[in-house]
Amino acid sequence: MSTNAELFDRACRSIPGGVNSPVRAFRSVGGTPRFIQRAQGPYVWDAEGKQYIDYVGSWGPAILGHAHPEVVRAVQEAAVHGLSFGAPTEAEVELAEMLIARLPSLEQVRLVSSGTEATMTAIRLARGATGRHKIIKFEGCYHGHSDSLLVKAGSGLLTFGNPSSAGVPPEFVAHTLTLEFNNLAAVDAAFSQHGAEIACVIVEPVAGNMNLIKPAEGFLAGLRELCTRHGAVLIFDEVMTGFRVGPQGVQGLTGVRPDLTTLAKVIGGGMPVGAFGGRADLMAHIAPLGGVYQAGTLSGNPVAVAAGLATMRLIGEPGFYERLSAQTARLAQGLQERARAAGVPFSADAIGGMFGLYFGDRVPASFAEVSACDTEAFKRFFHAMLERGIHFAPSAFEAGFVSATHDDAVIDATLEAAEQVFATLRA
């Protein structure tokens, strides 16, 4: 049996940094990444056979818990009939119809293979439909790794403290206006100066890539009003929040309807599926109907779509989100209570099946506030919890995820471990 350290050393010889996505490398917390061998329900097991309660959840998709038998069965049955056709299938039509039925803002939807593809194409579509070039995004909001969006982005870029990425020419981001999240006045000012040039505003309606930051009261409604007034397209990036925080995502919780929505993660059930969709008049600009090009060899892959369909059916059962939200809130509140009892500056927040942990006295509301949290305290907390078999995201700037299989016993075990760890942090 290889150890995690042996596997990481081996990986570093053939894979840049030893990982296929930067945050997995443990660079911001130090130490050796855990190489996961298998997963079931709320648990993962590493290469050394150690079991962990998992709050990474594949970074969001594992809303049903790992390896749900009905999802696994759907994948197996689909694979028997072929892994990829490069042609339309009835299953992809069924998934599109299901997404449209669940999200009132979707009139038409196009399937892709990742969240990055979805957001990249949604922005291209907004530009093509409006004939404008500038876009507005927000500090700390991550919309995938396409060039024009790697400006003060969240996720791994926050982990490494980079405001942007090498390899992105200044000309590529010249049309990207980056503003403070939750600062509606700044958006109003940008529209006052550049209104006729702005194609779209793209936003994580609940930011999940600079930890978890909720929208301020009126922020999303204000974006909707400004976009409508100036003829810009409002894009909700619900790659992370879509069907994770509620049955209609953040747009269902707030009643704010975007023009376009991007989705991924949960809709693939752990397989690579993304989507973008919205108003039919906008979607009519996408090839083959219009001049905005988008294509993908594996878009609508039948095996991935089978996983998505099975997942979407299961999360549509009555009471699913009420139970998920209650368990997530119980975890967040329990952690906060135990930290404060130990005298550790700490706050927690939750929405649906997502939560945020902050080593500071209050829940942050912006990129600057989350950046001011105590990352050294988080490192100590992360490793102490990992030693006790609790697997949180290896970054102070990532949201956490609870699944339907995180029952009372799992939450209790997590809180018991946290109580021990907070006592050591105080010492």
Swiss-Prot record:
EC number: 5.4.3.8
Matches recorded under Pfam families: Aminotran_3 (PF00202)
GO annotation, cellular component aspect: cytoplasm
Keyword DNA damage attached: no
Record has Transferase as a keyword: no
Record keywords, A-Z: Cytoplasm, Isomerase, Porphyrin biosynthesis, Pyridoxal phosphate
UniProt record similarity statement: Belongs to the class-III pyridoxal-phosphate-dependent aminotransferase family. HemL subfamily.
Protein name: Glutamate-1-semialdehyde 2,1-aminomutase
